[in-house]
Curated annotation (Swiss-Prot):
It is found in: Cell inner membrane. Belongs to the dicarboxylate/amino acid:cation symporter (DAACS) (TC 2.A.23) family. This is Serine/threonine transporter SstT. Keywords: Amino-acid transport, Cell inner membrane, Cell membrane, Membrane, Symport, Transmembrane, Transmembrane helix, Transport. It comes from the Bacteria. It catalyses: L-serine(in) + Na(+)(in) = L-serine(out) + Na(+)(out); L-threonine(in) + Na(+)(in) = L-threonine(out) + Na(+)(out). It is a multi-pass membrane protein. The chain crosses the membrane at residues 11-31, 43-63, 82-102, 141-161, 192-212, 216-236, 290-310, 316-336, 363-383. Pfam families: SDF.
Amino acid sequence: MKQESSLLAKLANGSLVLQILVGIIAGVSLASFSHEAAKQVAFLGSLFVGALKAIAPILVFILVASSIANQKKNTQTNMRPIVVLYLFGTFAAALTAVVLSMMFPTNLVLVAGVEGTSPPQGIGEVINTLLFKLVDNPVNALMTGNYIGILAWGVGLGLALHHASDSTKQVFADVSHGISQMVRFIIRLAPIGIFGLVAATFAETGFAAIAGYAKLLAVLLGAMAIIALIVNPLIVYVKIKRNPYPLVIRCLRESGVTAFFTRSSAANIPVNMALCEKLKLHEDTYSVSIPLGATINMGGAAITITVLTLAAAHTLGIQVDLLTALLLSVVAAISACGASGVAGGSLLLIPLACSLFGISNDVAMQVVAVGFIIGVIQDAAETALNSSTDVIFTAAACEAAENKAKLG
């Protein structure tokens, strides 16, 4: 019995990244050995993602309300520089995608459109959807995972409780701590969940269908790699004036890997919160910036919208001048910030960007269908970039504020 508990303790305290790596290798091996067996363990991945998605809304709501209610007067939360970083990073991602798309123009083999999808008719509709999400019923927001609404009600409750008695504030702090403990437990199950996700993905797709879109994927993933490994570190260096790579690599390893396999920014919120706690960041800051980042920090989405739109334009023989490309960068960045307000995310915002070049909705929906074909890799890489960048920019802004305070 003692030996069993010792083994469990070793597993619980061992390197999570190493355990996830073992899970990935085991998942690929099982799918290679037996497709049927791999499909049988798919439920492990679904359970893991389901658990993260279930706890994320209540975690965000309680953590935001608790941190604002318990916030000391004159406490600096650094939210303005973080939001600026989010918006600048998203625009830089769109611009990078434009440059790469023009250097390596891609032709698409267009397929049938996606049935039953309804893309937004314009940027106004995207903003309108986001505004209505802001005033959603709080219970409905928690049930449906509407993080714009959850943030709004969490901030409102926190401000209302700011002048409450210390015992009331302590209750919220204790509940927040309890939920954080539950999150840590769920995150320790990541190797098992990722094993199920990897096995199911390889068994169901085998990535054969994706091979025909190798050049398109190379441009997409190349743009995302440039943002993750060159542009983001450069932005962080400007903020903190030291080598940014230890922070960037740690965030990619501890946040990006999990996000890659869960393919859900919402499911990765608890992982990012736990990482911010490990980095000893200010709770008042990250409890708001991380869920906000999952909503508006969409560099990966901006890349997807831009690359697929320019690929469609090139396929149809449409010449794109520099000014139009710049305008596309702005539209893609704004649209990407609203991706969380659209069912289907970044892919269903492609028709909006295609309308800049007079591309018909029928053709645009065929481009969306191409996006769904490569979605296994595109969506995973996009989520990994988006989610890890939330922590990178939050940490950079917090450290920059600390350095400024030390200098007086």
